[in-house]
Amino acid sequence: MHAVHGLLGQFTPSLPMSREEIESFGFTFRDEYLLPYIHESFLGQVFGPHTEFVKQNFLQTTDVSGIYHMKPGFETQREVENFFSDRKDEDSIWIREGLYSLISNVLFVPDKKEEGKYHPRIGVQRDFIFRSLSEAEKNAFNKLYDQYYYHRHNAFWQQQAMKKLPQLTQSTRMLVCGEDLGMIPDCVASVMNDLRILSLEIQRMPKNPLHEFGHLSE
């Protein structure tokens, strides 16, 4: 495992996307979207007074003006973590976290099992590589992102759940409760209902996105 943060992970099991599927949404796939996008324009925002130190010690220039790559030995978050393992001062932590963010600044993550298949990186809309896209590219990417994270896996995960969860629920006499808060696929509610798994209800975290607080009557 080369990543420290979960942003570079992938669901298991999952249905990764081929280049052709990605481009069917009107988004042109490029190999550079798999590499960290590191541009001169935002390094100061990430590293502040440590910018020049970072450029000299962790980055290398490319043939494209203003674009950098990570130096060998610092190309993965795990390599960065190992380098800073005995450096616990505030400045070192600042630099380490900044380097983590550079390395995760990718649009797609290659699938670990299927060559030529990819996952849109979760939460990438908040990162610099997404901001570098044109408005048309952002719109196309958001369409494929929404399809991947909120629709593509529904039936697949429902099938997976019905294979595995009954063995768990039938193996105990305890009351079973599922943690179904946050980002969950639409199939979760029906699966839990079919298997009589209790839902976790917290009034401050309503399942209806239109409500700020949950209504006890619902």
Segments from the language model and where they lie:
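Catalytic cores of glycan-processing enzymes that make or break glycosidic bonds
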Residues: 1-218
